[in-house]
Regions:
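Bacterial N-terminal signal peptides
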Residues: 6-16
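Short hydrophobic "helix-edge" motifs at membrane interfaces and signal-peptide entry regions
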Residues: 8, 57-59, 283-284
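Boundary at the C-terminal end of the N-terminal hydrophobic targeting segment
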Residues: 16-22
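Structured, acidic catalytic/metal-binding patches in enzyme active sites
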Residues: 25-265
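A cross-kingdom marker for long, charged
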Residues: 260-322
Length: 322
């Protein structure tokens, strides 16, 4: 149970959408990407070695902002020279505000909801013949049995498939932030992080329309069929400061999150909290480092757009100096 919970919460850090699947595909409304529209003047290739950096500053403080991938290879290699230099003497390192878990008594409710999601026998038995063939081929390539996907819920099947796909191809949502946190703590730099309670969102999964859940499952299946090529290419672009190339990464889960009751409010809260944390870091003279997922960082009404709206100075990777 602990492992299943961990997998579900990991996927929900960027995803969500479910409900019982129909025997034949149902035409759902299109999924909306909350970060589809970017602030184009912020999408600039970095001129320094390694990944691209933005800055947010006032009269006596600079926050160096590193936009990080939402999905990347585990233990991804990147040029850390600029990061290491900025870590020295930093007031704080703000990690991505993407941590989600069931807190306190909410863990019990989350566990009960998960049991409901994991009931119903092999998921593939509920699929139309054409989709069943695709799904069976995908799970067999991952080395998994039909029993492994025991659920009547499209989201639960999609989450499990996504987790298995990521594990098989050694992809993660936590790098490079995990390495940055380790280096910051080793250097004695205070780490700022935030964890959200997944309980309410997990309950909302069960109320999401079946057609939307099916569409999310289809997107995950298509990603598993396509393989990790897009993600690996985007990761290489990110490591070289090619912001436009890095933005080509998969967007399955972010669109699904918006379809869940409360999903838009949750996305709004994470962006607002990230912007507020950067603004608070400016209250102390000196400099700090912040990591923010790349698209939420650069989107219209994203983190940098909000900070510019507060009158703070934002510079692009084409302007940032060492």
């Amino acid at each position: 149970m602990r492992m299943i919970v961990a997998l579900l919460l990991l996927a929900l850090a960027a995803l969500a959408a479910p409900a019982a699947v129909a025997q034949t595909p149902v035409a759902p409304p299109p999924l909306v990407d909350p970060d589809a529209a970017l602030v184009e003047e912020l999408v600039v290739t970095g001129r320094l070695p390694g990944p691209a950096w933005w800055t947010v500053s006032d009269a006596d403080t600079t926050v160096y902002v590193l936009g990080v991938p939402s999905l990347a290879p585990k233990r991804m290699q990147w040029d850390r020279a600029i990061f290491d230099k900025r870590l020295q003497g930093a007031n704080a390192v703000i990690l991505p505000f993407t941590n989600i878990r069931a807190k306190g008594v909410g863990a019990l409710g989350a566990g009960l909801n998960l049991l409901r999601l994991r009931a119903g026998g092999p998921f593939e038995a509920r699929l139309d013949p054409a989709t069943r063939v695709r799904f069976v081929a995908a799970r067999e390539r991952l080395g998994e049995s039909a029993k492994h996907y025991s659920t009547a819920n499209a989201l639960a099947a999609g989450v499990q498939l996504a987790a298995d796909y990521r594990e098989r191809h050694e992809l993660t949502t936590t790098d490079p932030a995990k390495l940055v946190e380790l280096l910051a703590r080793r250097s004695g730099v205070p780490v700022v992080e935030k964890t959200y309670d997944i309980g309410p969102l997990l309950g909302a999964i069960l109320r999401t329309p079946a057609a939307t859940g099916r569409l999310c499952f289809e997107e995950v299946l298509a990603q598993a069929e396509a393989g990790p090529g897009i993600t690996l290419q985007a990761a290489r672009a990110w490591a070289s400061g090619d912001v436009a190339g890095a933005l080509e990464n998969e967007r399955t889960y972010e669109r699904c999150l918006m379809a869940v009751p409360g999903g838009r409010q949750f996305d709004e809260r994470m962006k607002a909290d990230s912007a507020a944390a950067i603004a608070r870091a400016l209250e102390r003279p000196g400099h700090a480092i912040a990591l923010v997922p790349l698209r939420p960082l650069l989107a219209e009404r994203g983190v940098l757009d909000r900070l510019r709206g507060q009158g703070l100075k934002v510079t692009t990777p084409g302007e940032v100096a060492e």
